Amino acid sequence: MNILFIHPVMFHPQRGGIERVSDLLCREFIRRGHHVLCLHSVRDESRMDYAYPASSYFFPYQVREVEKNGLFFRSFLQEHRIDMVIDQDPQTYYTLYSFSKTLRDVYIISVIHYNPLGIYHHLGEFVMWVSGKNTIMGKIRKVARILKIPMLKYDYKRTLQSDYGGIFRYTDALCLLSLKFLPDLWQIYSKDLSRVIAIPNPNTYPAQENTDFLKKKQILYVGRIEWRQKRVGRLIDIWKRIYKKFPDWELVIVWETGR
């Protein structure tokens, strides 16, 4: 089988969770005898030295150039005789699906790597994250931002409904990370969900009440430094407020380039 992964950035496993999972999937599919290709929008020269398991190709135009990229996408599927497309960022690429449906026997799987309503639920927090000045004008601006939140959430939900409507129009399967996200998905797309599947985390571990190793008074964060999803800034802000009360503790942040 010829399998094509599509995602905006290359699958360097140190870049993030989606990239690591995709790298592992590519290797496993290849091990099982399948032919795997990857198609991206961004060519990152700083990550070209990694031994990617599958050949990487790139869209010739910006993401917003849907018609041009769509024609390229269809030609690419034909040239490489792709049987299955695994889209790791459906909200970016669903506008290309219609170009593949003129071809026979191309199966599309759209993978959602987050809660479909995750940002919607916390949009108010995002809007209010930047604290204004403690002045009359600063307080007026804060009130204005609070008043705008319902409209921002309304507009954002309509955008989600449009995006997911486009995804379901052509995809053969939509994969969630958990069946617990189905109620939120239902709020966005309330039609037939028979094509929805979920692959939850298969790893379960028993609670460890007693351990033999010595513990340090250390708070350890391991992950990429990214604001919207990881909220590392909030962790640092909290630590800034409390660290003087706990002088024998330390906060350690480890990310892909070091410590």
Predicted regions span which residues?
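N-terminal subdomain of nucleotide-sugar transferases
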Residues: M1-R43, H80
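Acidic anion/phosphate-binding donor-loop and adjacent secondary structure
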Residues: W186, S194-K217
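A conserved mid-protein helix/loop that constitutes part of the nucleotide-sugar donor-binding site
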Residues: R20, L24, W227-R241
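Glycosyltransferase donor-sugar binding loop
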Residues: H40-R43, V222, E250-R259
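Active-site proximal beta-strand in glycosyltransferases
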Residues: I3, M84, T102-I146
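Short His-centered aromatic/hydrophobic patch
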Residues: D87-Y93, I112
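A structural motif in glycosyltransferase catalytic domains
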Residues: S22, F29, I219, R234-I236, ...
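A short, active-site helix/loop in glycosyltransferases that binds the activated sugar's phosphate group
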Residues: R145-R195, Y205
